[in-house]
Amino acid sequence: MKKITLFFIALVACFFAGVECISAATAGGLKKASPKLPEFVTSGDGGTYYYVKFLRNEKVMSVSSDNCIRLYAGSGESSQQWRLVGSQDNFQFQNKDGQYIVVSSQSLGATSTGAANPNPLRPSTSEQPGGFKLQVAPNTDNGTGWEIVANSKSGNNVVNLWGDPGDGNSIGFWKTNDQNNVVVFVKPDSDLGAADYKIVGSMTFKPEHKLTLWYTEPATTAQLYSGGQGYSNWMEYALPIGDGQFGACLFGGVYKDEIQFNEKTLWSGTPARSSQGGKGYGKYENFGSIYAKDLSGEFGLTTDKAASDYVRLLDLTTATGKTMFKSAAGVEYTREYIASNPARVVVAHYTASKGGKLSFRFTMAAGSITADPTYANGEGTFSGKLETISYNARMKVIPTGGTMTTDEEGIEVIGADEIMVVLGGGTDFDAYESTYTKNTSALAQTIADRVAAAAEKSWADLYAEHVADYQSFFGRCDFDLAGTKNDMATNRLIDAYSGGTGADALMLEQLYFAYGRYLEISSSRGVDSPSNLQGIWNNINGVAWNSDIHSNINVQMNYWPAEPTNLSEMHMPFLNYIWAMAEKQPQWKQWAKLQGQDRGWTCFTENNIFGGVSAFKNNYVIANAWYATHLWQHYRYTLDREYLKRVFPAMLSASQFWMDRLKLASDGTYECPNEWSPEHGPESENGVAHAQQLVYDLFSNTLAAIDVLGDDAEVSATDLGILRDRFAKLDKGLATENYTGYFGTAIPTGSKILREWKYSSYTRGENGHRHMSHLMCLYPFSQIEPGTELFDAAVNSMKLRGDGATGWSMGWKMNLWARALDGDHARKILNNALAHSNGGAGVFYNLFDSHAPFQIDGNFGACAGIAEMIMQSNSGLIRILPALPSAWTEGHMHGMKAVGDVTVSIDWKNGEATRVELTNNQGQTMRVHYKNLANAKVYVDNVLTEVAVKDNVATLTGANGSVVVLDFDGSFTPTGIDAVKTDAAHDGYIYNVSGQRVNDSYKGLIIKNGKKMLKK
């Protein structure tokens, strides 16, 4: 992933603010609707008074005590309310106190958040000469709005929020098309004037389930570090829910409850190839938001009307969002949220402890797309079309008790006992159609039917089916560290985290693993398209890197935890995407031809969901080999032969691409030409280690798949011969060079390191670079073994590269150090990854990984890394506790999945395994490694069995579904037998003197048919 400047972070990561809009002509549905023009008065009294709100910081123009116009939260003061006297092209600002706004030549000095302001706006008793005019703001990063221009000023003449956005900013001038220029005009009676009511957080809350993210203030009021620095409340605090394809982010506002939603296939762009950032490429779009504005009258900005005992949470055990608080009268309010995969909708449920207390106005707003909602009969909807796909969203409000009315502005419910809101959304995208669309005319009815079907059910029924569905996946794998308890709000847990060994630190690490699996389930089900750089969640227009499908590490990392943490089904949208693009659609074959290859397929670094690519690093054609390894790994974990038969043609055609493309070097090996080690060093060189290791894995996997499929592989004898020849003569990308001290003393001079480039020294690279592209051989592959010179060289390369990294890079380093069998170093990287992000790597308070900005791949990389510390099987050898950190003295990891479709559960205490259970789901031969394996009693289906152990490795066999227990502490009791009873012992089976059933190979004192005997 490319670097991003802090300025660009600030540009793309701001919170999207909904603005009242009117329709405008659009091109491809991408241009935002024009903002609504405020009312102008010609003279005299009266007219409409507005807050003039800057979208960048959600603050309004206010008269300050130092005789300036500054930006503060609206509080209803008369000096904050402005009318516009004149016309759009020439008007004056006048507040309710009769003051005007003028451009001053009395400058303001520099502050910690901004440079000196030479021409600040100030209040005056006189009008501004020449007046002001309004023009539509071209910048829409934070929403659609206006720019204010001083008519008498030349050069930089657009009113501008001065300095970094915060509280108390002065107002100066800048050039047009800056996000700090954009304002909207809001009627004070339709705006609280503050981000939320007065909120008092709970002091006593404890979550029902330990695996819960929880907070004592809404995302709407929570403070951002250093005044924001471009990060948004969405990125820092909003909580994600998702059904795998359709999802939402929850803010927990009491005054205005926003549910911001996304759909995985809501992409602008086309299948074409375009320049980087070009229009044809498109981007992942923000679908929109629904708002529930409180009309109860129970809450306000003062302490006597505060919402007290406030808590909002995301329960990972049930995939449920929740907000809870009380009124001054003691009424308890609860709001619950789910994204139901069975129902394919998002559902919000509002209740109160006393009847008749729920009153809201519900509205919808489109996000980064153009659409105006319409309302009728308790429902709201909007729709539109982008360059390729069409979209539709619909909500339905279902109150119990009270009254409901619908007008052109929204849906109002007064005095209800309970309210359920059902939200549906989708597009006409189809991964298998040549146009990438299908059933466009039926889309609106499809969404309407989906919403109606859910609305017919009760909340209890919808919730029950949602939880049952979700837990069938989430409940398979359980990671627990002894002594942990979740009694600290998650933001405080992060702030207090120091990577120590205390219960709070271990709780955060345990929670982070569970969150990774939660995000995998929530972002990767349904449509055959992979999760993107932000999973399925995005709330802004100018999202970083278009929130696209990056093929040089990022999308692959999204799926690293899928197989080992027993979420194999979540891998399928990515695998089916690869298969469809490689075999069914033409684009990836076109990109292969663009690179001079008549056979096979490939894609480049940046990809959209239509097979389209940007022009960035189009020589990164090795992506096809990396993608194909995912096709094979899924087979290794599931042993699904029919699946392998289906996807094998994609593996074979990727191999054909490289069989034809490889060049024979002067040393007699085959090299990948014109390659690149992402994103690092020489931009074009033959024999780069990254590409060589990938092609080695591709060829090895393809040959292994041919062995499995036999004649069903349908490989010609010619191709098979070429494949074997190229594989035998392939440069494996596993050369070493001696370190010369060029980058300092991280490793001794003379140490061997892995070569990143065959023909260039390591000195062509960058010290501490975030990509470890030449270490594919260690992770995610297993091409080098512990105890070898190459293994040691890889470890030296990691030490030399250092621990500093971006968020996703730390995810990779965690896995690399786990494969290096150094659990404490792997946990050290985890410690770094869990530090709060203040402009760089770490996590946000909602545990989103920070590159920066938010990138979800780091969440998945860390989840996989924790799994690798506990169990590894990629080499075919099941390693038990291969890299257990010393801080994790006691705990368990139940329900992991090993290669060969083996379910593995491990318990440990004092850093040593106490029990290991292996369920052999398909009767495979299992090779298991553990340092003290010879000390374990081995039970196969409750039968004590002698097993040969050599070099801490045992080979175990069994029938389909057989369970092997490795008992290290003597605590295991075979099911159904505690001791030998005389009448039960006459069954022909063999027991030891402890009453445990043993097999026929057992030697020693035994009991058979009720008689003791010595078996030699």
Report residues per predicted region.
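Aromatic-residue-lined binding/catalytic grooves and analogous aromatic/hydrophobic interfacial grooves
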Residues: 197-615, 635, 652-655, 665-670, ...
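Residue-level detector of functionally pivotal "anchor" positions at catalytic/ligand-binding pockets or at interdomain
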Residues: 193-196, 971-994
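C-terminal catalytic domain of Rieske-type non-heme iron oxygenases
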Residues: 534-535, 539-540, 552, 670-676, ...
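Catalytic cores of secreted or luminal carbohydrate-active enzymes
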Residues: 286-302, 856-899, 903-904
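C-terminal tail/sorting-segment detector
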Residues: 1005-1016
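Terminal processing/anchoring signals of secreted or surface-associated proteins
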Residues: 1, 159, 975-980, 995, ...
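Short, glycine-anchored, charge-dense loop/turn motifs used at functional sites
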Residues: 516, 993-996
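Lectin-like carbohydrate-binding module/patch detector with strong preference for beta-trefoil
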Residues: 25-197
